[in-house]
Amino acid sequence: RPPPSGRRQAHRPRPTVTRAGVPVVVMGVDVDLEAIANLPKGTEHFLADIHGEYQAFQHVLKNASGNIKRKVNELFGDTLRSTEKRELCTLIYYPEQKLALVKREEKDIKDWYHITIYRLVEVCRDVSSKYTRSKVRKALPVDFSYIIQELLHEHADDKDKTDYISAIISTIISTRRADDFIIAICEVIQRLVIDQLHILGDVYDRGPGAHIVMDTLKAYHTWDITWGNHDVLWMGAYAGNDACICNVIRIALRYANMTTIEDGYGINLIQLATFAMDAYADDPCEEFMPKVSKDNPLDERSKTLTAQMHKAISIMQFKIESQIISRHPEWKMDDRRLLNSIDYKKGTIKINGKEYTMRSCNFPTIDPKNPDKLT
């Protein structure tokens, strides 16, 4: 009701009552936001030029480019030997594999569990210190959320607290959940040590696992990307651009790495292989031999087939690109139409007004009168 005088009283801001899930506003100020603004800035992780090297990428994510090692050194300093700190870091990076090794070698596994869990809690407490309790809680696995929260927020300042923490850890061990708990808290550390991941171009290229990198990113908590030229090339191939498709396959064949195309995306290249073996049956295709790494050796027969496929797709790419350039004279890229600059009888090519002898002039799929025409 209005006051007896008939005048309305001016509205005066009052402190709100704290309610679950509702921001606390005092005199127009959001207390939660003000508090969050005063927290240390979360660690941002920048990675560039992955080029499909998924194993190196996953390892860098797990160790946060050395950030976990640095925190372990800061926390334990001279209280742990260098070997102990290295083993703790390895456990955080690869908990399942390290646990399997420890269980084969450790004589007193219960004692090891107790000491290790205590150390992992210390690391987790440190990496979570930049965040609100709400944000940390959302990062915790459901099975161990309550236990991890209790361990993180209880400090062993007195005997009662020490006994409480020790009892929690002992219960984890006695109920045979130690392995599961260690794996869970190691994954929490990996997640909290990096607040935001920034990918600076080229997930795709010559490496064998660009698709695995993308699957890893899909499962990552928060990231953004600046696409690189190779990424855009793959997008063009996905969109159906013939020149991009040829270029993607050519690069893969150049490095003898068909894993992403064949295994990652299930694209069968049998037709290309059949065509290449027929068209270049008597051609060693030495100029198109793949760049083979020591980790991915090929026998001579496979190298020859890959070189034939490499040459076949390269000629297709040159033809298609030349067709595109001819349709767009405004681009002023006629100098890139190299198939039209070849004298197929003499075996020479003219570039910038100068004539060069070609190392090979075996082009059975090219019509000298119409070099851009696909067969």
Residue ranges of model-derived segments:
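Feature recognizes metal-dependent phosphohydrolase scaffolds
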Residues: 1-375
